[in-house]
């Protein structure tokens, strides 16, 4: 850390750190999206900066003999000024079904459309995968020149999915991906309420326990 950075006010230090984290995330998504990149966590440690990458296909991100990870680490250190970057790649399938991550679903739709598959066919395939994975609710929106020269959008929804409020902002997962085809740019937006999500208004009322039953339970 330079002398100038040490003299910065606290709020400016926080802004600088958040700006650098955003730049790292943007670079990782740009460089690794075609290899199954989903998300990342950036953690400051006494030994440097630990970057945890969540991926659908970890072996592709690591590369042959770790070539891709080494290249990314070198760019982060030289171009973005990340101090001693240490990259760990985690397979999301060991944590949760990949279909519960909207970025995975959005990239699958984008890649299929880039190969010439019709958008409706891809959307229905994604709907089938999400329902089989047990998603509580989801919404898929594809926008662009779908069937005419004028841009429009098509939306498919399923289950219980909140669009406003605390749950929608902090618990429902959302991702937006763009794909460039011959007619123009298409946007794919995916929102998913994962199977493990419990909404704030979902609760169970326990039936009252009679005093006699409570006394018997204590005796037992």
From Swiss-Prot:
Domain of life of the native organism: Archaea
One of the GO BP terms on file: translation
Cellular component, GO annotation: cytosolic small ribosomal subunit
Residue span, KH type-2 domain: 24-93
PROSITE patterns referenced in this protein's UniProt entry, alphabetically: KH_TYPE_2
A Pfam family it matches: KH_2
Subunit: Part of the 30S ribosomal subunit.
Function in brief: Binds the lower part of the 30S subunit head.
Identification of the protein by name: Small ribosomal subunit protein uS3
Organism of provenance: Pyrobaculum arsenaticum (strain DSM 13514 / JCM 11321 / PZ6)
Species lineage: Archaea, Thermoproteota, Thermoprotei, Thermoproteales, Thermoproteaceae
Gene that this sequence comes from: rps3
